[in-house]
Amino acid sequence: MPGQGFDMNELMRQAQQMQTQMAQAQEQLAHETVEASAGGGLVTVKATGTGEITEIKIDPKAIDPDDPEMLEDVVLAAVNEALRSAQNLAQSKLGGLAGGLGLPGL
């Protein structure tokens, strides 16, 4: 409608630009690494910004044949922390892109 300032072509251009920026940000995230550790550094986990676990290091001191549950808990804690870090990284990279269209709720 004339006079309301709504330009569908401009909206489509912005959407395409945002899609390109999103793809670039996701590509960057795939190449960025976060690291987390648990158990005082006995277990260290690395993950990409997209949440793919790329490495788990376990200090031999963490391996107690009489208490495998302790190692399981420490590995789980380190993995969860690495995934949280990856999510935070992704949010910081991608979070501002949705607002680019100026639409409420995005």
How does the language model describe each region?
Residues 31, 37-56:
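N-terminal intrinsically disordered, cationic/polar leader segments
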